Amino acid sequence: MHGLLLAAGLLTLPLRALAHPGHQSTSILSRRGAVDLDAYRVSAKAEYSNVNDVAENPPAVSLMSSGSYVDIATELVKTTLPGVTFRVVNDHYVGTNGVAHVHFRQTIHGVDVDNADFNVNVKDGKVFSFGNGFYKGEIPKENPMVKRDFSDPVHALKGACNALKIPIKTNKVSVKSGKGQESVVFKGTSGALSEPKGDLVYFVKPDGKLSLTWRVETDVGDNWLSSYVDAKDSSKIHGVTDYVADATFQVYPWGLNDPTEGSRQTLTDPWERNASEFTWHSDGNTRYPTTRGNNGIAQDNPSGGTGYLNNYRPQSSALRFEYPYSTSMSPPTSYKDASITQLFYTANTFHDLTYLLGFTERAGNFEVNNNNQGGRGNDFVILNAQDGSGVNNANFATPPDGQPGRMRMYTWNRSQPNRDGCFEAGIVIHEYAHGLSNRLCGGPANSRCLSALESGGMGEGWGDFLATAIRLKANDTRRTSYTMGEWASNQRGGIRQYPYSTSTTTNPLVYTTVNRYNRVHDIGTVWATMLYEVLWNLIDKHGKNDGPRPEFRNGVPTDGKYLTMKLVIDGMALMPCNPNFVQARDAIIDADEALTGGQNKCEIWAGFAKRQLGTGARYGRTNRVGSTEVPSECR
C-alpha cells in the first residue's frame, strides 16, 4: 500500500459569516422569505428517567437479569405502559461504554405514531435509564386501514409543496407502492434530488392531539423535508423536520487555528486503522486513486447540482495529494485540488476521532462497508467542495442510517480574495457534528429527534463545542476564551454574541437566557457555553491530551478533554427523542455513571450549575427556571 502524502492545509476559518446575515433559518425556503420553517417545528414531549430516578423507583421488570437486552427493554415498555402497542425499531446496539440502546415506536392500528418514541438504555442486564415520549391521549377507535378514511397521497404532496413553497413540479405525478403499509413513491415529479416519498403515519400535534397524516419526504438540496400533512385536509401542515442543518459556527483544524497561524504540512497515512480499517482510499472491495473511500467521497460541485459521482476530483495512482494553496490565490477554482483534499482530510479525521469515542457502525456512523460490525452501510458522506448552490455558509443533510449524508461547503465573499470554507476545519467539524448528533439522538434509524426548538439548539451547540474542544492548544487554561468564525467572516469577534469562556464577565449566558431566544443558533451558544464549563472542570481534574487522538485506560479516556467529548457523545445516545437542556444534562451525568461509575459527577454538576442548570433547574418553553444548586454530596 502506497503511503498517502496528504497536503492537509490545516487552515481554518472561524465562523462569523457562517451565521446567516441577520438571522436566517436553516432552510433555503426561509432565506427566500417565503416560509419560516421554525413555525412548523416539532414539539418536545419526552420524559427522561435518569439513572438516579431508576435507582429510586426500580421498574417492575421481570427480566431484570435474564433475557437479552432487547427483551429487558421491551418488558420495561410493557410494564410502564400496559396496553400500548408498539414496535421495536431495528437499530438497537451496544455502545462502547457497555450500555445497550433500544428504541421503540408507538403504533395505533398498526400505523406508526411518527413522533412517539420510547428509548431504553440497558447496562449489565438491568435498566439503566429510559426516555418516554409515547402518546398518552385518547386512542382512535376505528382502524383507518379498514375505513380508508384518508386522502390520496398525491394531495398530500401537492399540499406540502403549496404550503411550504417547495420547488417541485407535481402536475404529472403518479404513485407507486413503496416497501411499507400505505407507503408510496411519487413518480413523474421534477425539481427534487430524489423521488419524493409518502408514508401514512399518526402525528402528535403541538396541542397534544393525534392526527392521521401523510409524512411526505422531499429533498430539494437546501432542504430535505419530512412534512406531516393532514390526511383529510392537505392544506394543513402539522409539523416539519428538515434533515439539512446550516453552519453558523466554526472550529479549527487539528493543530492550527486558521491560515494566519501556521503552514500546511504534508502528512503520511494520517488515518486511524482502528477506525478506518480499509484506509481512507478503499471500501474493502475497491481501491480508489482519488478522494474517495469508505467514509466519504469529496469532489467539486461548481454548478451546485445533485450529481456527484461524475464530478471532478483529483487523481493520483500513487496517492500523493499535494497541491498548491495560499490565501492570496484567486479565484477559488485555481486551488480546487487543495480544497477537495483539505475537505477529504478533515472529514475523515473527524470520522476516525468520533469512531474512537463511540460513533461506530452500530451507532449509525457514515460508512459504505460496515464490515459486519452492525448498522446499515452504503452511507458514506458526500463531500462537496466549492459548492455553487450558495455562498458564505455550509450545510449537512442527515437522513437515517443506510442513506448517505451530504455536506456542501461554500466559498466566502466577505473578503478579497474570497475564502474557501474547506480550509476552515471548524466549519467541516460543525457540519459533520450534525450527522453525529442526529444519528445518535433517538437512534440511527430516526433522524428527526433534534427537530424541536431546544433540541435543535443543542444540535448547533454540540457542533460549536466539539469544534472548540478540538482546537484547544497546549498552553490553554480555563482562562482561555475562543470566538467562532473570525477568519471566515473577516470580522473581528466572530459570529456568536459572546466568545466561549468560563468567565461570566466575558460570557454571561445562563439557562434562563434561553427564555429570550427563539433561534436554534442562539440557544446552541448557551448549551455550548455550559459544555465548555464542564470541559475545563474535567481538564483541571484529569489534564489535557494535546494529541490528535485519545488514549484510553479500561475504555475511559485518560485526559479531561477527550473524556468530556466521550461523555457528551455517549450522552447523546442515552437521551430521549427531542430532549431539553435538563434531560441532556442528566444524560451526560448518566453517561459518566455508565463509563466511570460516577467519578466525575461533581465536576459535571458544578459546570452546569455555574450556568444555572443545577439540581433545581426546570424546563418550560418560555419560563425556564434556573438553579445554581448541586447535589448535597458535591457541596
From Swiss-Prot:
Positions annotated as propeptide: 20-246
SUPFAM superfamilies linked to this entry: Metalloproteases ('zincins'), catalytic domain
Region described as Disordered: spans on this chain: 279-307
EC class name: hydrolase
Residues annotated as binding Zn(2+): H430, H434
Gene Ontology BP annotations: proteolysis
Entry's Gene Ontology molecular function annotations: metalloendopeptidase activity; zinc ion binding
Subcellular location: Secreted
Pfam family, one: Peptidase_M36
EC number: 3.4.24.-
Active site: E431
Cofactor: record remark: Binds 1 zinc ion per subunit.
One annotated Gene Ontology cellular component of this protein: extracellular region
Gene3D superfamilies named among the record's database cross-references: 3.10.170.10, Neutral Protease Domain 2
Keywords assigned: Glycoprotein, Hydrolase, Metal-binding, Metalloprotease, Protease, Secreted, Signal, Zinc, Zymogen
Signal peptide range: 1-19
Glycosylation-annotated residues: N274, N413, N475
InterPro entries: FTP_domain, Fungal_virulence_M36, Peptidase_M36, Peptidase_M4/M1_CTD_sf
Cofactor: Zn(2+)
Functional note: Secreted metalloproteinase that allows assimilation of proteinaceous substrates.
Protein name: Extracellular metalloproteinase 9
